[in-house]
Structures are given as C-alpha cells and as structure tokens.
Amino acid sequence: MAKIDDSVKKKVPELRFKGFTDDWEERKLGELGSVAMNRRIFKDQTSENEEVPFFKIGTFGSKPDAFISRELFEEYKLKYPYPEIGDILISASGSIGRTVVYQGEDEYFQDSNIVWLKHDDRLNNKFLKQFYSIVKWQGLEGSTIKRLYNKNILDTDISIPSTIEQNKIGMFFERLDDTIALHQRKLDLLKEQKKGYLQKMFPKNGSKIPELRFAGFADDWEEHKLGDYIIQYSEKTKQNNQYPVFTSSRNGLFFQKDYYKGNQIASEDNIGYNIVPRGYFTYRHMSDDLVFKFNINDLADYGIVSTLYPVFTTNEQLNSKYLQYQLHEGSEFRRFSLLQKQGGSRTYMYLNKLQNMILNIPKLEEQQKIGSFFQQLDETIALHQRKLDLLKEQKKGFLQKMFV
C-alpha cells in the first residue's frame, strides 16, 4: 500500500493499494441505487410452526422467533423485492445501521425496519459493507429520531473509487473481518471451556466431592466457616492521597484514574479510606442483583478504596486464588447471597456476614492446584482478548485511512 502526502488536497484516501491514483468520486447513495424492502408481513401470517424464518428488528442478526409458510414466501419472493446474495441488509430502527450480509438462505425480513440498497454495478457490496460501518447518515446527526428513513439513506454522501479498487478494499477488510471472527470464536470457546470446568471442579447439590478433580486427590471436601480462614484488614489512610485510589469493579481492580480515563472521582479528601495491601481482597459490600466481585490487589504494593469496600486476606490454610474462584463461581456463595436479601432490591454483604458463610473446602494442595489452573486459564483468555482488541483497533485505523 502507498501512503498519500497529507498536503495533497485531493479526494483520495490517506492509504491505498499501489497502482491506484485517481480521485474518488463524490456521489449520493440515491444516485447509485434505491432503497428496497420485503413485502409487509402481518402478525396473523406468522407462526412458530411454519417453515421459513421471518426476521423482525428484534431478531435481526440472531435467531428468528417467527416463521411464515413456504407458499407465502415463494409468492412474495416472486412478486415483490427480494435481496440478492451479497446484498447488505440494514436495520432502520432500534440500533440503527446494524448490517447483515444476505447469504442466499430462504428467509424473509420485516418491511421498513430491515432494508437494503438495490444498486447498479458501480458499487461493490464488500466495499459498501465497510462504508456502512463508518457512515454518518444524512439528517440523523444530533437527532433523537430512532428511525432511518429512505430519504436519510438516499441523501447520504459516499466517495467511491473504481470498482476494481473497491473490490480490493472490500476483500482486504473481508479477510480482516474473518480473522477477527476467528479470534472471537477462539475466545468464546475458551470462555465456554472455563464455564464447564467451573461447573465440574466445585461440588454441587450437597456433594462433598467435585465431578472433576486432579489426579491424586480423593478425600471429601470439608465444611468450614469462612471466618476461620479470612482476616479483616482495618488499616486506614492517615494523610490525603497516601496511596493510589483503586476502583473495585465487576471487571476487576483498576487504578481509578485509568478506569475513568484520566479522572479521579474519589473525594478530594481521602483520609480514612481503607488501605488494600498487595494480595489482599476488596469488594463492594452491596449489590442490586446478588452479584459480588471479590478483587485481589495485584496492581501496587498498596492502594486505597472507600470504606464501602471491606478489605481482608486469607490465612495460610486457604489459597486466595482458589477462594476467589469459589466465591465467584461456586453454588454455595450464590445460595448464601440469596439468604442475605431482606426486602427491598439491594443485598448487603458486610464482612461479618461473609465470615459466617459455610464452604466446602479441600486440602490446601488441591486448593493451590485449582487456583493455579483457573489463573492460567484466565491469563490465556486475557491474552486472546488483547489480541482481539488489537485486531479491532487495527481495523478501525485502516477504516479511517482507507476511506475518504
């Protein structure tokens, strides 16, 4: 690819394939085609028992929950507009601008809510798909309207190169999208594998042993009161900004300035905040949906959190990583959380309540193996997530530089 000098004020992208130098042409989508949609389908024409999927705006891009008869489908497909293979279907309401490539399956789409541009051979669909991912629809900027009308589509500006260059650009992004999709599938598979292991490696339904365990371990897990294993840490700051401020979230523990993108929202006076030493737990003690996340400080030797976030550590008989997974994924904590809910919508999990919970716990060596296993699995998942995020950022950069 050749990079174009920024000083050259021409209708060309910053980055393009070698051999292409002509200006891109400015057009409106309405000059290149017209908006098409399927014939209206009424509710009494749909059923869960018919043969042909009927996609409404709520199921567009996912699984259908309504179907039409084969006879009606064939009649309407013959008489009224119907997409061709490769056409880019667009959501015109709800989440405006979502796209699905029509692959040729027998299926029908809700009129006016799902549309496509019926265009001539001046437009390449692969190129058009990528354009849709960055387009600013005419007339919708700053609007609160949640509908994309035909006029919005037809009046939208587009800059296009030759069809040969369009095809090269479209193929480039198609390969990149395929790579992103492959990494997404790998990531999803790892997450599913973790979910399966979590279900099998902790006892459930009153059992004293898990369904799946490491070789060499056969003893029953024993019931223990968690308070026998965890120790509250009550040290508080004595001066302002004594240590970095943490945010303990459902996605992990973060420096607050990173979590809020450069801003620190804690009180300017954080004297009296709880101190969190490295390796210690902290968590938000209240929840509206029975979900609590117990985060371990692996960011700094010391950090601080609001007094709404208790701090504790484990003694030498309980592996902290093992405990973290058991609290997040074990059935005992979910049941215990439900018991703490006393009217209203909010559940409070004070540390003294947590200390009263009864857990089935294996010997320390087995704890360590379980904790290490899931930690390694999480690190693998995080690595795949970083790769996926990088690919998405690379695509974003290419889109900015390869379109006018």
Predicted feature locations:
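Extracellular/lumenal glycan-associated surfaces
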Residues: 19, 167-179, 183-186, 222-224, ...
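Non-catalytic DNA-recognition/assembly elements of restriction-modification systems
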Residues: 15-39, 213-237
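Short amphipathic coiled-coil heptad-repeat segments
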Residues: 1-21, 185-219, 386-404
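Short, charge-patterned binding micro-sites
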Residues: 27, 105, 208
